[in-house]
Amino acid sequence: MTRTRSDSLAAGGLNWDSMPLKLFAGGNAKFWDPADIDFSKDRADWESLSNLERDWATRLCAQFIAGEEAVTQDIQPFMAAMRAEGRLGDEMYLTQFAFEEAKHTQVFRMWLDAVGMTDDLQCYLDDLPSYRQMFYEELPASLEALATDPSPAAQVRASATYNHVIEGMMALTGYYAWHRICVDRKVLPGMQELVRRIGDDERRHMAWGTFTCRRHVAADDANWEVFENRMNELIPLALSNTDDSFALYDEIPFGFAKEEFQQYAADKGMRRFGTISSARGRALAEIDVDYSPLQLEDTFAAEDSRVLATSA
């Protein structure tokens, strides 16, 4: 691509009130360093768990770190799609997004090292066929497609896959599980801080995905059907991952019930439809400064806090 101008030099400068740059500024303001998290108490807490509990938690952590690594590797075509569309603000935000995914990979690996889980953990994913289909097939295929087809429809498919199903259902459900483990048992303070920090980052990631789908739906109503179809394809796969995880254990640790996590994941997925649908027929200029995607993620976080405070 030949460069002909610099958008940062345009009259009026950059629109700092636009959603992507609002998220970019928020990420800068909330910067954190994994090395600052104290994992020193987590080793003793980890060893106080039963073998069954450690096995379950290791599988949960393996899914997280492998997922963070996958997105670190797969997200680049979305940046190129933003460049092809001439959206500097989105491109700036996605550079931060990619950095944060790499940082999340780092911090989960640091935690595993701190609690002594240094063996090969790949086996913890071998018995999770839905997880492997999502991360080994659906995610890379939908993002790599943007390298040759950066169209709005392809962007909506990619965002629905990652931001709405993987982050917006699977990851949120996993964070909820970590909160239940840590808060109910009053253990693993380092993991609690790790999840709090990552959750804050990923609320911005999900908000960007919602914003991206909303602006494409506002521009062309046909993209609503693209979003709806992709979500309906993948939601059953996301819920199946919960089935796969619970099916591996005759005895379920931590007092967990499969139905609780299925309901949690389904609720988060279904509520995303309304936020995207509300953009239909809207003016693009309105969508660009509409912060409802971020407000939705903050609402989810506040709801979780209330539930966990009740169970503590």
UniProtKB/Swiss-Prot annotation:
Co-factor(s): Fe cation; Mn(2+)
EC number(s) recorded for this UniProt protein: 1.-.-.-
Keyword set includes Signal: no
Binding site for Fe cation: E101, E167, E202, H205
Cofactor note (record): Binds 1 Fe cation per subunit. Binds 1 manganese ion per subunit. The iron and manganese ions form a dinuclear manganese-iron cluster.
GO molecular function: metal ion binding; oxidoreductase activity
Residues bound to Mn(2+): E68, E101, H104
Keywords: Iron, Manganese, Metal-binding, Oxidoreductase
Domain of life: Bacteria
One GO BP annotation of this record: deoxyribonucleotide biosynthetic process
Gene3D superfamilies: Ribonucleotide Reductase, subunit A
NCBIfam families listed in its UniProt record: PRK08326.1-2 (NF006199), PRK08326.1-3 (NF006200), PRK08326.1-4 (NF006201)
Quaternary structure, from the entry: Homodimer.
Function, as annotated: Probable oxidase that might be involved in lipid metabolism.
Similarity comment: family membership: Belongs to the ribonucleoside diphosphate reductase small chain family. R2-like ligand binding oxidase subfamily.
Protein name per Swiss-Prot or TrEMBL: R2-like ligand binding oxidase
Highest classification ranks of the organism: Bacteria, Bacillati, Actinomycetota, Actinomycetes, Mycobacteriales
